[in-house]
């Protein structure tokens, strides 16, 4: 929602009248001249809702509208449909600009719009605006890898970051401490949530913008890229009445997407599903979502305690970070709740060790754990240019070790379709650990991680084997699987 472009905020405040085109509503002050009302009606059409407001309400409506979206969405939507020359835009920007200027034609706003639109077109997950001694750099994280997009004059760094702060409602005068904010954009039917993080450095502030396209999330177990056997195991796990299901992996490995897909599969009128997250990345209809807020001592542990008093059937904790949260999660699972959460470990069996290190007793773990999913994200080979090449002797040895027969594998090439990278999009590789009676007994007996890993391998495929299968099918490359799964090779040795 925003004021129609011919009527910017400054005009609306001065003329005491504004047109909210997405609402089909004209708002005005009680003492606005009648001639002015007639004039705006002639311009926008007669069939509009007319709302008389007090001075305070009028200013509040304008402030809410312009802080949420000051022309960015409309301009971004236009930019997405046309080729944007970021370099020429950065070169025409003056070193000084009115940061509070709401005119979407202002150079700083045009450049911010162009950067955002280019990132959305390229399906970037993050935008990095970085300052160094003599230069500044704007990089996009595309398919998990940072790519330099623009290196404008360093003089523009403070101006760009200050403008982003205005959009995110941060303090533009405070440059000494980190700040976090958000920008909500609506582009056509797409809702884009932009998480903004600023950080002071020795050469000026840096900013990272995380883009969350709420419409791009495919919340279905079918879209997780699991094998038929792993998907069946997961479907069986989430139908259990109680227990803990963990998703493990490093930051940016798709753990949240997997959890949201599980929640969507469980989301029925007969279940009360509650979450505590940091932050709430995607809003799910029919699920009660709570956000961690450390400023008021709203931690994972405190939030988990609270939602357990809300008669839940399924509980999702964004991450188990400390002993208190781990112990509450275990107790919740033992008292009849299905608990979903994440941990930062390299393998599924490593999650057991991590929980033990947090102080959870082995006999409690053996009773509460239902299953663990370890996962990584790998880049997909571009289907337009990928080639199949013979395997090397070293590669053949690895495939043979995992009992996989292969003669050729997919390799990246590079073409205009994938910007010469050889890759387009990402997919997950998984390691599924279902806690069987044998595993439950081993956990109860406090066996070490290596012994537990060997027992898991007897029943389930290793993460790297799942990746190698996708190399054989041409979905990803050998280098990608080695890049993300090499740390798991040590545990198999």
From Swiss-Prot:
Protein residues bound to Zn(2+): 382, 385, 415, 418
Instruction: List the subcellular locations.
Output: Cell inner membrane
Catalysis: reaction(s): ATP + H2O + cellular proteinSide 1 = ADP + phosphate + cellular proteinSide 2
- Enzyme Commission code(s) on record: 7.4.2.8
CDD domains reported in the protein's UniProt record: PulE-GspE-like
Cross-referenced Gene3D superfamilies: 3.30.450.90, P-loop containing nucleotide triphosphate hydrolases (3.40.50.300), Type II secretion system, protein E, N-terminal domain (3.30.300.160)
Please give an example of a GO cellular component term from this record.
Answer: plasma membrane
Give cofactor(s), names only: Zn(2+)
Keyword field? ATP-binding, Cell inner membrane, Cell membrane, Membrane, Metal-binding, Nucleotide-binding, Protein transport, Translocase, Transport, Zinc
**Pfam families per the record?**
T2SSE (PF00437)
Q: What induces it?
A: Silenced by the DNA-binding protein H-NS under standard growth conditions.
List, in alphabetical order, the GO biological process terms annotated in this UniProt record: protein secretion by the type II secretion system
Question: Which family does the entry's similarity section mention?
Answer: Belongs to the GSP E family.
Q: Which NCBIfam families match?
A: type_II_gspE
**Self-association state and partner proteins as the record states:** Forms homooligomers; most probably hexamers. Interacts with GspL.
State its role: ATPase component of the type II secretion system required for the energy-dependent secretion of extracellular factors such as proteases and toxins from the periplasm. Acts as a molecular motor to provide the energy that is required for assembly of the pseudopilus and the extrusion of substrates generated in the cytoplasm.
What other note does the entry give for this protein?
Part of a cryptic operon that encodes proteins involved in type II secretion machinery in other organisms, but is not expressed in strain K12.
This chain belongs to the protein called Putative type II secretion system protein E
